[in-house]
Amino acid sequence: IINIRHFTRYLNATGKRAYIPSSEYNVKTRRYQPYIFNDYELSRLFDEIDSLKNRRGSEASNPHLILPVLFRLELCCGMRPGEPLNLRVEDVNLRNGDIFIRKSKRGKDRHIIMSEEMRQLCTAYDGIAGEREWFFPYTDGGKIPVRWVMWNFNKAWNKTGLPIRFNKPRPYDLRHSFATQTLMRWVDEGRDVMTLMPYLSTYMGHVSMEETLYYVHLLPERIKSSPGINWDMMGDIYSAEEDFYEED
């Protein structure tokens, strides 16, 4: 419906009369509500992540070295949970902070730049990890399985003892928090959010701007009213998308 709506608008703009389907034609499906961490929750969560230790008999090695870096990449660089696991050593340039993400969602490659603080953390980890193929290696030298990452994230969250405000947090929600924190920082700095949105979209590897604009609607009400967010420019993108948003 969204593609048809955009196409019929284009036809009308070129002088050809065409019916533009209204929102009543939208397919209604349940949308997952991302868990956006507050500062205290993130502080408690990473306290527990930083203190995780290996289980007796576990096949994974050095969780106390790997997990603090891996989860911070997701939070500080907006990476999808599987992307850090697919990094080879040569994909992480520790001199300039460039990370090459290969064949991620929909087979797309992209480059992202780490902050200086994140680069220093990765450099310190690299010096300890030694010779290897994968930036975050499994005990057999291969890639770490997603199930191990999920298990440790859940373990860390449960150890915080924090109440769950709605849906239980997942590693993917670190990526969502990165997006909303970036938008809130731009608003606080008085920047034009709509002008900067394409940069965030490219950085996160989104296929379309609609996927990135979704995050505007997760912001607190006081921020959504900022002059840096031009709702007229957004049109009805979100109203058309909101009932069938695909997590990206």
Language-model regions, residue ranges each:
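Conserved catalytic core of the tyrosine transesterase superfamily
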Residues: 1-248
